[in-house]
Amino acid sequence: AYSDTPARDNFAGDGRTVQYREGLYVGYRYHQTAGVAPAYPFGFGLSYTTFAYADVKATPQGVSLTVTNTGARDGAEIVQVYVAKPDAKIFRPAQELKGFAKVQLAAGESKRVTVALDDKAFRYWNTMTNAWEVEGGSYEVRVGASCEDIRLTAVVTVAGTGAPNPYEGKSLPHYTSGKVQNVPDAEWETLLGRPIPDDTVKIDRNMTLGELNHSRSPLCWLIWNPLCRKSSCMP
């Protein structure tokens, strides 16, 4: 339901600005990090056959594994590769999709599948350096049939860029937990690094009828209210 999404309180914005308080936590990245179970997980699909995954090998440049069609019918499987860093110092989703491959298999057939990982697989945007950076250390490369159906996991070590942690010493409990519904203004401003923009508008010849709603002037409200009711933008 829409009420279960992290953007429920901020989208669509009706002012001059739209606040994306959910940050990185969109779709499955929110559901998995915050522990919210959807009806169907990201990547889920049905098939007339079944598949087994085995013999995973991974490096920072890619992952390979053997996929076997264990059913009685021919079929296709989409192998999905997720990357996670359980000991991350930078807040991030529990795991993120970084690659996938579709493989066609006859009944009983096995194939070796390779999914490449590029330089974007481990990086994050650092607001202090204004550049893409990599947090060094161990990462889990998870292979599965959906974000919830992880079949194999391998650990790789990735060299970091040594950038400072832009969130060190900052209180961001909603973002570190991924539970980004109802983020308070103070925490949002801490992450934003500046005050929340004021949506009130100055009355001048360039303002639109829609902006009358955001003026502090009672006169603007008197004009806007009947117009909005007439156009059914208010109940």
Please place each PLM-identified region on the residue numbering.
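C-terminal non-catalytic accessory extensions
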Residues: 234-235
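Terminal connector regions
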Residues: 118-166
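Secreted, periplasmic, or luminal enzymes acting at the cell surface/secretory milieu
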Residues: 1-76, 82, 136, 140-144
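Short acidic, flexible loop segments centered on an aromatic residue
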Residues: 72-89, 95-97
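Intrinsically disordered, low-complexity Pro/Gly/Ser/Thr-rich segments with frequent PxxP/GP/PP motifs
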Residues: 89-127
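Short flexible coil/turn linkers enriched for glycine and charged/polar residues
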Residues: 71-75, 107-109, 148
